[in-house]
Amino acid sequence: MVMTDGWIVAPPRVRLLVCGAADRGDDGAALVAAATLLPALSEAQRTLLEVRRCGQLDVDDLVGMPDGLAGLIIDVAIGVPPGTIVALSFDRLVAGDGAVGPRSSHALPVSQVLGLADALGHLPRGTFVGIGGRRFGFGQGLSRVVRAAMPAYRDAILVEIERLAT
């Protein structure tokens, strides 16, 4: 518990890691989702979150997370059809259980970053929620298919926030 202006505030339960680049087409999908989802959350829902914009996911974003704090990575994914939404647990991504999993559009795939955190003994409970992207060129906006899927992407993120917070 944390004391703020005389009020006792519970610590956040979910670290929301918002990945992507706004100037790289569909790579900015998670930024758009967060920018439109967060203001629509209730005060109670917002207090559950610690939000970090990470651009490219790094193992430092996960190492040292306090016990009880779950991770939620949102990012665009390649390797899944454009506009398709995927939600995979960190454990499943690390295990590489043979299922086709998304890869971040960044240099180091999400599964490898999670694997590093696991090797260091710091893999938190958590989920990756991605949306398949189509174009990633500099200066491009979101593709039509990603824009059309944005409401469902925000809904999937909210479902995971609520699930991980319990």
Language-model regions, residue ranges each:
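N-terminal catalytic or cofactor-binding beta/alpha core of small enzyme domains
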Residues: V2-L123, F128-G133, Q140-A152, L158-T166
